[in-house]
């Protein structure tokens, strides 16, 4: 039986990916970069350290990166945050995990204030044992740093006793590099095949599907 679940947030617990994608796309366009919204969507889930180099040269990242990131965060908060909702059965899943003594950690490329806000949106305040944010690491997913810090907070629970739940290949790659079983959440941006190829042991259709198959979740580590 697993002893801990590490959760991604955006696109996994809350329906925020499209808002982030539109905010990043607009911020990039304001600074003269036009990768296209579809291309940006497929980079959401990475931190700015990993996202920006997909579209900018190293020199452009140095010159414009901080301003683009700041603008994207501001656009998300002013234009999209109010529309973000939790996916069905998120709180139900967290309550069941808590009842069974399974620890729950949030691992996000976002800032601490953003993760706090996400807990409010997902209605899981008081149901989270620990969180890892961009302030805790120098490299975001798909680097394993975030997962490794989460494991440190879970000690003495081992990597083999945990699973990581996320919606992107970056989540799966980060988890596998840290020795943690990766589980995917199906979504319109990445196919199940892409998630499996990235390292997910299994892909569930949604958090509600994961909750429905809860007994299988417990035996997946």
Which ranges hold each PLM region?
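N-terminal helical cap/lid subdomain that shapes the substrate entry/recognition surface
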Residues: 2-91, 96-102, 113
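Asp-based, Mg2+/Mn2+-dependent phosphohydrolase catalytic module
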Residues: 1-3, 95-98, 111-221
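Short, charged helix-to-loop "capping" segments that act as catalytic/coupling loops
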Residues: 57-66, 104, 148-161
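Conserved G/P- and acidic residue-centered "switch" motifs that form tight phosphate/ATP-binding loops
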Residues: 8, 12, 108, 167
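Residue-level marker of regulatory loop/turn positions in helix-turn-helix DNA-binding domains and
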Residues: 86, 107, 139
